[in-house]
């Protein structure tokens, strides 16, 4: 999947993956991670998610990584924030207060960029990537993030033969294999097929949304 795909989705405003409210799983389960105030949290493929502002509101320093400059611009504009912009390596870094959005290719991140990220939040990153890219993505996370990191990961599981994706289906065993070396605990699994007409029309009988806590 090429970067141009996501750039075009944002250009055409085809952003059905964007949620108009803070994710309820985040609000429910994030507190149990017990991250200290001021902890830095990595949010891969963040878009203009409202979850970024929520995390900052909990006292965290937020590092979102997003390919689309349009998404980054929209986040700061929609929150009424003035951002300082600078170049750092392969990324254009936008900053306002405790929120930094790094505009560029996630796979260009270096270990020193995220060495102090002790939190991870992935609601729509791993499910946005086809199988080979998401294996590379999870391997990169494990290689970059420090040993004391913990966070939340949200996945979807359905019959992939019915829909091409994204979002892509990620099976439980694939997620656990991708986070080998981490402690992986499933916190919740909910069938959301009744709220997902696209999947119903495609013939899917279930759409399982899973929430995991990952830590090491």
Curated annotation (Swiss-Prot):
Reactions catalysed according to its record: S-adenosyl-L-methionine + a thiopurine = S-adenosyl-L-homocysteine + a thiopurine S-methylether
Keywords: Cytoplasm, Methyltransferase, S-adenosyl-L-methionine, Transferase
One protein family per Pfam: TPMT
Location(s) in or outside the cell: Cytoplasm
EC number, UniProt record: 2.1.1.67
Protein name: Thiopurine S-methyltransferase
Protein family (similarity comment): Belongs to the class I-like SAM-binding methyltransferase superfamily. TPMT family.
GO molecular function, one term: thiopurine S-methyltransferase activity
GO CC, any one term: cytoplasm
Residues engaged in binding S-adenosyl-L-methionine: 10, 45, 66, 123
Biological process terms in GO annotation: methylation; response to metal ion
HAMAP family: Thiopur_methtran
Matching InterPro entries: SAM-dependent_MTases_sf, Thiopur_S-MeTfrase_Se/Te_detox, Thiopurine_S-MeTrfase, TPMT
């Amino acid at each position: 999947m090429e970067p141009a795909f996501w750039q075009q989705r944002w250009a055409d405003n085809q952003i059905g993956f964007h949620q108009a409210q803070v994710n309820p799983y985040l609000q429910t389960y994030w507190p149990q991670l017990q991250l200290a105030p001021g902890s830095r949290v990595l949010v891969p493929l963040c878009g203009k998610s409202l979850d970024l502002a929520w995390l900052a509101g909990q006292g965290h320093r937020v590092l979102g990584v997003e390919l689309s400059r349009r998404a980054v611009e929209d986040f700061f504009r929609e929150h009424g924030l003035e951002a300082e912009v600078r170049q750092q390596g392969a990324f254009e870094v936008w900053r306002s207060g405790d929120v930094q959005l790094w505009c560029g290719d996630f796979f260009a991140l270096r270990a020193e960029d995220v060495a102090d990220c002790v939190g991870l939040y992935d609601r729509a990153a791993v499910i946005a990537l086809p199988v080979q890219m998401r294996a590379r993505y999870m391997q990169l996370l494990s290689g970059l993030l420090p040993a004391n990191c913990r966070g939340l990961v949200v996945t979807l599981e359905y019959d992939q033969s019915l829909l091409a994706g994204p979002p892509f289906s990620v099976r439980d065993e694939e997620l656990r294999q991708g986070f080998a070396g981490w402690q992986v605990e499933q916190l919740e699994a909910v069938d959301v097929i009744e709220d997902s007409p696209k999947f119903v029309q495609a013939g899917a009988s279930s759409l399982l949304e899973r929430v995991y806590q990952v830590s090491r």
